[in-house]
Amino acid sequence: MKLKYLVSAMALVVLSSGTAMAKTPDMGSFHADMGSCQSCHAKPIKVTDSETHENAQCKSCHGEYAELANDKLQFDPHNSHLGDINCTSCHKGHEEPKFYCNECHSFDIKPMPFSDAKKKKSWDDGWDQDKIQKAIAAGPSETTQVLVVGAGSAGFNASLAAKKAGANVILVDKAPFSGGNSMISAGGMNAVGTKQQTAHGVEDKVEWFIEDAMKGGRQQNDIKLVTILAEQSADGVQWLESLGANLDDLKRSGGARVDRTHRPHGGKSSGPEIIDTLRKAAKEQGIDTRLNSRVVKLVVNDDHSVVGAVVHGKHTGYYMIGAKSVVLATGGYGMNKEMIAYYRPTMKDMTSSNNITATGDGVLMAKEIGASMTDIDWVQAHPTVGKDSRILISETVRGVGAVMVNKDGNRFISELTTRDKASDAILKQPGQFAWIIFDNQLYKKAKMVRGYDHLEMLYKGDTVEQLAKSTGMKVADLAKTVSDYNGYVASGKDTAFGRADMPLNMTQSPYYAVKVAPGIHHTMGGVAINTTASVLDLQSKPIDGLFAAGEVTGGVHGYNRLGGNAIADTVVFGRIAGDNAAKHALDK
């Protein structure tokens, strides 16, 4: 029988009474007092970097997250969009716990149990160059055919593709949980020529996908990469579905001429659905996935071929993994303030919607060995990040019918324009913010909107007039905006701003609004790759043994990325990178 009474007590402590139950200085001591060190650790005690055994012990006593979920709590860490992550992501054995939710949110809650425990310096705070060089001099402590760095969508897809091609794979990530930026993606995956489009009667063409992406990127994209993205996008959706993902729903993202963004039915966010699917597939296929394992240096031989990497493990320290192929899938640098200030100084004070792991590690390591960069100084702002927060208000909300207005309640641009144009337009409005407004129809249709309500981000009014008063908008202006927009929906033509897709009117009470402003969302550039996802050197020649996919790369999206193309990028080029990395390794 699981310790459900203890679980309930601890859940209440987390969100109410602080450290009331903690009579010992830390969680490890608490469990030792109840039994022994072996209550958590294997005998003899040897903790892996992923803390796999310890997490299994947690669940053997306390139950899986589904059992721990408590719908009586306003915010339930055990039932969140992060999915089934490691217990030790937040609960620490012999040190102060860490409430990871507040890395993005600002929940006003009491301390977690054992929060009076000693706070230790982060295990990966800084890189010890002497130890890195010693690890290289000692040579590989183990070898694999393919080493994948970064366990987001690109990394998981690369690992699964390499495994399918017959290679042995090790997948590492510096975070205590997998997912990366993909885990917090809300929109979906763009694809052309899918069964979903056929079922919904949507006519689309590969040429249209390419044209839309190139136009959105201001013609600065590498058209060869965009063509591959378009041509292989439908197969990417089918691949995810074969692994168990649900992508039945369709909507239109900004810059697309038709509905081509595939997402889960019921209004769920796409990121958790895709990452949970990939996590399960990697586990089922026996891929060696290591968390708390930060790659700190790529290792090259005298011929300048990549032959492995130095890893800094939370418990194992610095060691080298020898690999015939390495895939970089480390994401962008949207959370690296120094890199943002250097490459895009005008955005250095902006908030970011990114996962805290998006610190540009892969870019820096690739530059160190002579990799070429492309579009590295282009950074995309998402127009609708919750004002004074890091919570992304998904483009899906506008895509399924919401309207954007300024502080007075007046529209100022088509809601489905590209992100760069929408961001620029918002920054030209009084106060440099906007309101996203919608009615109860959209509230019921888009599940993520109910999440914003749960986070107390929504303003509400039983009438349009009440909504205007609660937000400070001008009553007459907002009333006219809603009336005019409903007329456009009825006629099928937006004569004010030319919005092509208007799936919902605003006629059903109550009415809602959420305050938004632009925030750093996607770093457009990174390492240069070719059509096989090989990383290029300064002479535009492939670096032997090094591949890359996802936001760590540049060239796919040009100056500005369209919503839905990032997940497509991670799936399509993640698979290409993994497949070619495996072929390279197996041929050596």
Swiss-Prot record:
Residues holding heme c 1: 37, 40-41, 93-94
Highest taxon listed in the record's lineage: Bacteria
Key word Transcription regulation present: no
GO cellular component, one term: periplasmic space
GO molecular function, one term: oxidoreductase activity
Cofactor(s) required, per the database record: FAD; heme c
Residues annotated as binding heme c 4: 81, 101, 104-105
Keyword terms, alphabetized: Electron transport, FAD, Flavoprotein, Heme, Iron, Metal-binding, Oxidoreductase, Periplasm, Signal, Transport
Residue runs in coiled coils: none
Cofactor remark from the record: Binds 1 FAD per subunit.
Induction cue: By anaerobic growth on Fe(3+) ions. Not expressed in cells cultured either anaerobically with other soluble respiratory substrates or microaerobically.
Main location group: periplasm
Pfam families according to UniProt: Cytochrom_c3_2, FAD_binding_2
Enzyme class: oxidoreductase
E.C. number(s) listed in UniProt: 1.3.2.-
Signal peptide limits: 1-22
Name by which UniProt lists this protein: Probable fumarate reductase Ifc3
Organism: Shewanella frigidimarina (strain NCIMB 400)
